[in-house]
């Protein structure tokens, strides 16, 4: 995988994680209720699933596409 593709995907997955963290924080702190998403725990569970998938993808990328341990620590 070339470096530009690697970094682009990494940023995508990191942005997904940040987005989910923000949404979970908003749900819990601001008591925001979205009419079509009244099940707050269900919505938080969906967001956690999305985060887990993004983290798994980052881990796979680091495992298979980072050349050495020093590079893995930088990312």
Question: For each of these PLM feature ranges, what is it?
Answer:
Residues 1-75:
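Extended, charge-rich alpha-helical interface modules
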